[in-house]
Amino acid sequence: MNAIWIAVAAVSLLGLAFGAILGYASRRFAVEDDPVVEKIDEILPQSQCGQCGYPGCRPYAEAISCNGEKINRCAPGGEAVMLKIAELLNVEPQPLDGEAQEITPARMVAVIDENNCIGCTKCIQACPVDAIVGATRAMHTVMSDLCTGCNLCVDPCPTHCISLQPVAETPDSWKWDLNTIPVRIIPVEHHA
């Protein structure tokens, strides 16, 4: 019984010693992150889709901050993200990537042909924003509100039952330009 207590004490002391060494090393050799990169990374949508040409949002944020990369390459974030980054960096807003985009491309969303889906879950594993729901050997479906149209779920599908389709433009999904709607202000008199 005495040997067990000695072993427990020895392991505890070793754990305490290594913990203290790791704690000291983490403070002594800490790497300070660039606060601008952190702020840009917080603005980006974290979809990790790779449409900007970088493997994720963090490398794109580093490229913007350190290498002077264009701020208009985030397709899922669109114009709203580009404007926030421009405001943060005090630079001029740029047209969305595509040099001189005249027409904004239609928003694409993944659609699964559920009759051909075998429930392999490869699309679920590939989706960076968890927009696909389903279970093993069960039908899968896409939550269109979450889908960024990044196309990463199409190639892994063994039955090729996933396709990207444009989102139908409805009054709910249409981008309203409220500044072009004529509004007449009618003065109201208050009577006491």
Curated annotation (Swiss-Prot):
Domain of life: Bacteria
Domain spans labelled 4Fe-4S ferredoxin-type: 108-137, 138-167
Cofactor field: [4Fe-4S] cluster
MF-aspect GO terms: 4 iron, 4 sulfur cluster binding; electron transfer activity; metal ion binding
Binding sites annotated in the UniProt record for [4Fe-4S] cluster 1: 49, 52, 57, 74
GO cellular component: oxidoreductase complex; plasma membrane protein complex
Pfam families, A to Z: Fer4_21, FeS
Alphabetical list of Gene3D superfamilies matching this protein: 3.30.70.20, Electron transport complex subunit B, putative Fe-S cluster (1.10.15.40)
Positions of the 4Fe-4S domain: 32-91
Cofactor binding: number and manner: Binds 3 [4Fe-4S] clusters.
GO BP terms in the entry: electron transport chain
The protein's enzyme class: translocase
Protein keywords: 4Fe-4S, Cell inner membrane, Cell membrane, Electron transport, Iron, Iron-sulfur, Membrane, Metal-binding, Repeat, Translocase, Transport
Subcellular location: Cell inner membrane
Residues reported in the UniProt entry to bind [4Fe-4S] cluster 2: 117, 120, 123, 157
Residues that hold [4Fe-4S] cluster 3 according to the record: 127, 147, 150, 153
Residue ranges of the region described as Hydrophobic: 1-26
Function per UniProt: Part of a membrane-bound complex that couples electron transfer with translocation of ions across the membrane. Required to maintain the reduced state of SoxR. Probably transfers electron from NAD(P)H to SoxR.
Record PANTHER family: ION-TRANSLOCATING OXIDOREDUCTASE COMPLEX SUBUNIT B (PTHR43560:SF1)
Stored NCBIfam families: PRK05113.1, rnfB
Record-linked HAMAP family: RsxB_RnfB
Family: Belongs to the 4Fe4S bacterial-type ferredoxin family. RnfB subfamily.
Record's subunit section: The complex is composed of six subunits: RsxA, RsxB, RsxC, RsxD, RsxE and RsxG.
The protein, known as: Ion-translocating oxidoreductase complex subunit B
Organism name: Escherichia coli (strain K12)
Designated gene of the protein: rsxB
